[in-house]
Regions:
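The alpha/beta-hydrolase serine catalytic core
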Residues: 1-2
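Catalytic active-site module of serine/aspartate enzymes centered on a nucleophile-bearing elbow/loop
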Residues: 70-101
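Conserved serine/cysteine hydrolase catalytic core
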Residues: 5-67, 76
Length: 101
């Protein structure tokens, strides 16, 4: 098992703790700054491969991304969760390849 000891789990634990859930979180200012700058990419093609059953990035987040990138090419995999490439790999890989061509 990859997470059989604290030494193997600590990085994941720190990553989760760094997700800003409150405006007072130390990462929130940086995340907001990045979000404010996303509009600079609106003239570029954007493709999203989205899991319809994602427990973390739900439909509310997808709507936000669609508002930022109205021309975004969205592939919604209704049965996929957070790990789209594991749940809908063949289809997602095809869609990503199409976007890159």
């Amino acid at each position: 098992f990859p997470y059989d000891s604290w030494a193997h789990r600590v990085a994941v634990w720190r990553f989760v703790r760094d997700i800003p859930l409150a405006s007072s979180h130390s990462s929130m200012a940086l995340l907001k700054d990045i979000g404010d700058k996303l509009k600079h990419f609106q003239k570029h093609p954007v493709t999203a491969c989205w899991g319809g059953k994602d427990f973390c990035f739900n439909q509310q987040y997808l709507r936000k991304w669609n508002n930022i990138f109205p021309e975004m090419n969205t592939h919604l995999y209704s049965e996929a969760g957070h790990y789209v490439l594991e749940d809908a790999g063949e289809e997602a890989i095809q869609d990503i390849g199409d976007a890159l061509r």
